[in-house]
């Protein structure tokens, strides 16, 4: 089918009304609006809810420096009523804590004994959160396009990855690869390399089965100067002198795969330093992409004025091009502040409001581990969605989603929009044209609700239900053909790579440019066991999975636990009390608790992320006194609380903790009890059950080489001391 026939077919696709170039060029910009006051109203909120509104241009189609085509005549009254209905039906009462909006996201910090940990940015209910996250922008933008510096217009050099990735790929190749993914006739060809003595990488690219393809390392010169940055960014970030090397060692690892639009899964070391460095780099990359996208459209606008008969495909269905997902408002504040500082734009609308709602200088207690202090500092609210709109002269925060270039959100915040219980009120069209996605601090997000991340992927790059003033004559064919996922770059940054992280990058990403992952090589001296400092028996017991079925792994683990570990507790030759069973997954916890209630006579208690404060205090006290022999303890509760459990004499890890810090923290419960003279380290034991599928966690606990032996050797029991 020819391009013209496809385009003709799609003119009325899903009820779209084609809006051609001639019609667009006749639309005149409305006069600037004035704000009646500083107080935001529900009519303001309605601007973001109404994706049919003519108030703001919401697609890439813009004539003018920020490509807005605005219309004074919005549908405010209708939207206002609809919004009131939404708020009243879904939020009948203000809730005391934000996490109670979704029980699956309820953090134990809500019910903790340390009030400082629980403190959020004021008592905010769900309705107020929606207002904060979905505020519209009423300002008109009359910046002069003619002020654009001609030297900063893209040269459209074919060596520019922006050009080669989005504009130069043959349509035939895209069709073949798309069909190959649908028919599962794709394989990944990979190349491996070394980054340092303790770190390697693997780069894999999708190839149609049966076709020959050469896969080369993505590394060029590991220099930012190899890429075509906009002049404004060079000036703002001190990148004019090529004789200087502005990149850190971490940034040199990432700059080539990142600026070549490859998917990235990066495991970093330092909470503070590394996070700051990779954010510096991806903020620059995001801004470069936004600026190039805008300038390409402006250049083509001029070309169409000179020659209306030419065709220029440079847009998607809607305007938003970048989605950044972060766990808390504190992280969102740091990311947005980084983007603002690197943008080269001085005017930032509603910056003060953003700082008031996202910035918080409060710190957790210094008695908590450093990692806890880092993750839970500042504003830990996890319910927000904020749009950023870039014009020639300003950055507008809290912009309408369809009017935004970048959307910064938490998983829970965007989940409440994408998965509204009322199907008629659901919205996801603003995610139809996302070309860059960033997931920052995935290790923290996993303890909120990782399923929300998978939900976001389900809604990315779909054909929108509404037109949103899209000009089909300028929409790229791979958008119309539902092939945008092949072009989207996804970047995931995490402190610890997990099976969930691998599942996201391997199973939900189809970037034709391939995917890049790093791998940390952990020496035994840097492992959890190597750094514990306790001379205590640590026993690792492997159970085998018939057929290596991931789906059946929980059943095999449970069977091994009930047939081997539980009888060992009943007939223990060691301590009969003070046994702590550490369980990472809540569903496993429920299963074990029910089994011990119904099938055993063991006197046990439990504390988990949904326990009331009364239950937490009572069971911890009874366990310390020895009146409860066994305590079930969940990883999510430990993540949010970092309790010091007293009275622990032995530990059983139902599964290796994904965070190696947790392993040592729990083992030290025994050490602290021994220091008080309540237990003997020669009698106490630490027991961890694992399978081959726990390789990632094992590496961090025992070291890379030892983990390989534990996973694949014939011997099933290993002991360290």
UniProtKB/Swiss-Prot annotation:
One biological process term in Gene Ontology: maturation of SSU-rRNA from tricistronic rRNA transcript (SSU-rRNA, 5.8S rRNA, LSU-rRNA)
Compartments (UniProt record): Nucleus, Nucleolus
Sorted UniProt keywords: Nucleus, Phosphoprotein, Ribonucleoprotein, Ribosome biogenesis, rRNA processing
Recorded GO CC terms: nucleolus; small-subunit processome
Feature: compositional bias, Basic residues: 15-31
Family, similarity comment: Belongs to the UTP25 family.
Protein function: DEAD-box RNA helicase-like protein required for pre-18S rRNA processing, specifically at sites A0, A1, and A2.
Protein name as catalogued: U3 small nucleolar RNA-associated protein 25
Gene label: UTP25
